Amino acid sequence: MLEGGVVSRKRRKRILKLAKGYYGAKHLLFRTAKEQVMNSYYYAYRDRRQKKRDFRKLWITRINAAARMNGLSYSQLMHGLKLAEIEVNRKMLADLAVNDAAAFTALADAAKAKLAK
């Protein structure tokens, strides 16, 4: 009777290698390691999507803070930019807000001018 020792050992080694660095028994025992590796794959999949949401939230927070320093709310700024037909994404706006205040102020002034009309 063959028990597939080579195949089983290879499978277990692969899982334990993936579990390297995990805390406690999760990197030593096959069953707990396998469970943790499965969870890790789930967390990685979930958080790749979460990261996009988190960055968008961060950009909006930064844009809002800079917009308020220029006398506008976030929504007013975005609406004004849309009316002015200035297409700049939130990532770039947030970068300008942090690294180039003068350029952000120019965009905010353009948005204000369109909102005033």
Swiss-Prot record:
It comes from the Bacteria. GO terms for molecular function: rRNA binding; structural constituent of ribosome. Belongs to the bacterial ribosomal protein bL20 family. GO terms for cellular component: ribonucleoprotein complex; ribosome. One of its GO terms (biological process) is translation. Binds directly to 23S ribosomal RNA and is necessary for the in vitro assembly process of the 50S ribosomal subunit. It is not involved in the protein synthesizing functions of that subunit. Keywords: Ribonucleoprotein, Ribosomal protein, RNA-binding, rRNA-binding. Pfam families: Ribosomal_L20. The gene is rplT. NCBIfam families: rplT_bact (TIGR01032). This is Large ribosomal subunit protein bL20.
